[in-house]
Amino acid sequence: MNHFVICINNDSNPASLILGKVYRRLPDPEAEAHNMLRVIDEDKSEPNGYLYPASMFAPIELPKVAVQALIGSR
């Protein structure tokens, strides 16, 4: 599973999403079945993330060092 996405459209929520920024994607099979993604956005008040249309993001692969910097080593 790809754990990171990049915002490619923030028209519907510019306060919570920054165009071109990398966001952590959380697993949510039910949301994905409806073409939605659960994402930790700029608000960060909801630790379980918010749902956004998948069309607002593009999946990306990051090097291990970048993943560790974003979520910590596990």
What are these regions (language model features)?
Residues 2-56:
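Basic/aromatic-rich interaction segments and small domains that mediate binding to polyanionic partners
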Residues 45-74:
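Intrinsically disordered, low-complexity, charged/polar segments
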